[in-house]
């Protein structure tokens, strides 16, 4: 009830706030789909009304204040919406909650936001973190059927984005574990990562390294490298990412994909080889095919198909922008197809 009242108060205040501060913008995405999902031989096919399928449904406010001398104050607050039920995230501004400074030195922000690793990983995704078997299939946690090759967000974080130096950019982040218990290591709960990218003409390449520690300071390392080339009517992307944890063998994801223009729309295709070295015959191959058709600059329709074919002991699933679909048993294949609409405001 408290969260509902807070949300209502924030929304009610936005028009007056935006009028008083013309550099404040309210924005959002509403994305809905109708899908048929098959989780394997031990489950029946199901009709799923999806939310956030191409892009996670959300609303937010962002803005800036000119402080003079080329310096700006910037902020962003963003909340997720499950528009199939009307529910919102348990943490109200779970997606982004940041404030910082921007200038010739780059941008420094404090709060909760996307990690440089996650942002870099998405640059070699042919489906831009949306639709069946986008690269979230690789980055989501193992319990959600993924390979956990990049942490999506840090809380309690400090973020730095550099300006471009001849097409080269550097992004870094540190998250405090805020550990005060003397019985625990100081580094418990911490995380940090760095990404370096280059973009020049039709070529973009980049990589990242990430290290996180759990509540008892067990360490997990992640890295990735990839890029793409835009030929005009066709864009090719490819990459490799890996996760390794203390006491466990690695998980990995190798992908190749492409985007081809077709009239006013575009065809997207991608193949991901998902690896699990902890068990024999536990890998999987994920495939995606989609068509996106714009109706305007802000509204588009889409149709998509995806399948994840697990080896005998594989438990990998399939992911859209906001939802994970898990195999019903080791070795089961997951597949689905559907259509949807996305509106950006």
Residue ranges and their predicted role:
Residues 15, 21, 66-68, 104-106, ...:
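Outer-membrane beta-barrel channels and translocator barrels
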Residues 4, 45-57, 92-95, 152-156, ...:
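Residues that define the transmembrane beta-barrel architecture of outer-membrane proteins
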Residues 187, 191-294, 304-307:
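Detector for outer-membrane/organellar transmembrane beta-barrel domains
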Residues 165, 329-345:
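Outer-membrane beta-barrel "beta-signal"
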Residues 9, 60-62, 98-100, 159-161, ...:
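Outer-membrane beta-barrel architecture
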Residues 24-32, 69, 73-77, 108, ...:
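Transmembrane beta-strands of outer-membrane beta-barrel proteins
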Residues 21-36, 46-177, 188, 197-201, ...:
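Outer membrane beta-barrel
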Residues 1-20:
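Gram-negative bacterial Sec-dependent N-terminal signal peptides
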